[in-house]
Amino acid sequence: MPKMKTSRAAAKRFKVTGTGKLKRNKAYKRHILTKKTTKTKRNLRKATMTDETNVKNMKKILPYM
């Protein structure tokens, strides 16, 4: 059986923590920022964990992470 391929798009967007959770950056911070408050933009800078409902699918497209 051939090797499984890693989704390169996902590999660039997610990192695995020491405990095996997937860390990601938040969306909505590339443009149209003038109507967002400073507090909102500051909170968007923080990384967050991937939701548990998506972890099963993420493990399939990131087999070696």
UniProtKB/Swiss-Prot annotation:
GO MF term list: structural constituent of ribosome
Annotated InterPro entries: Ribosomal_bL35 (IPR001706), Ribosomal_bL35-like (IPR021137), Ribosomal_bL35_CS (IPR018265), Ribosomal_bL35_sf (IPR037229)
Keyword tags: Ribonucleoprotein, Ribosomal protein
Any one of the GO CC terms: cytosolic large ribosomal subunit
Domain of life: Bacteria
A biological process term (GO) from this entry: translation
Similarity annotation: Belongs to the bacterial ribosomal protein bL35 family.
Classification via HAMAP family: Ribosomal_bL35
Name used for this protein in its record: Large ribosomal subunit protein bL35
Organism: Agathobacter rectalis (strain ATCC 33656 / DSM 3377 / JCM 17463 / KCTC 5835 / VPI 0990) (Eubacterium rectale)
